[in-house]
Amino acid sequence: MGQVFLLMPVLLVSCFLSQGAAMENQRLFNIAVNRVQHLHLMAQKMFNDFEGTLLPDERRQLNKIFLLDFCNSDSIVSPIDKLETQKSSVLKLLHISFRLIESWEYPSQTLTISNSLMVRNSNQISEKLSDLKVGINLLIKGSQDGVLSLDDNDSQQLPPYGNYYQNLGGDGNVRRNYELLACFKKDMHKVETYLTVAKCRKSLEANCTL
């Protein structure tokens, strides 16, 4: 009986520590999701503003080109649809999100479109991406328990953006800006989806469908 009473404080402390870790994990997930939602909204606004400066024919032509082209981050292996996203583990979704955010660290500093919103927010976007990357890395460390490291991720090395856009021709600047903004919007939507699903899984909610 005495041994049981001695074990009770240890079990209580362990329970409190576990609850504290779970609460901290949820707090980090909430911050990460809120930040990527803000980035996604900013990306959508910048893309819409840039489209508004184009003539209708230009907009249609660029949209056709973009649908046939690829984003630089497409080399990062990620779920192809909602079903695959829901089947992916929390750790896998976090790793993909980390790589996607990482892929925008340099391009976010080199966007030089003639758009007042972008000029005002370029530094802010870079800072938010950097903060989000740190936050996702903390979530990965809290989720992996030594199972997988970032170096073990099967994502390929991203090609440099300079090479990606070097052969765009005379209208390359407009096309480059359009593709960068469209890809940024697309990738922030991906990260928002992945982090939202991962957060839901960690909260043990009954329904995490997209």
Curated annotation (Swiss-Prot):
PROSITE patterns: SOMATOTROPIN_1, SOMATOTROPIN_2. The keyword Secreted applies. The lineage of its organism: Eukaryota, Metazoa, Chordata, Craniata, Vertebrata. Pfam families: Hormone_1. GO terms for molecular function: growth hormone activity; growth hormone receptor binding; metal ion binding. Disulfide bonds join C71-C183, C200-C208. Residues 1-22 form the signal peptide. It is found in: Secreted. Belongs to the somatotropin/prolactin family. Keywords: Disulfide bond, Hormone, Metal-binding, Secreted, Signal, Zinc. Growth hormone plays an important role in growth control and is involved in the regulation of several anabolic processes. Implicated as an osmoregulatory substance important for seawater adaptation. Its main location: secreted. This is Somatotropin. Gene3D superfamilies: 1.20.1250.10. GO terms for biological process: animal organ development; calcium ion homeostasis; growth hormone receptor signaling pathway; hyperosmotic salinity response; hypotonic salinity response; magnesium ion homeostasis; photoperiodism; positive regulation of growth. Zn(2+) binds at H38, E192. GO terms for cellular component: extracellular space. It comes from Salmo salar (Atlantic salmon).
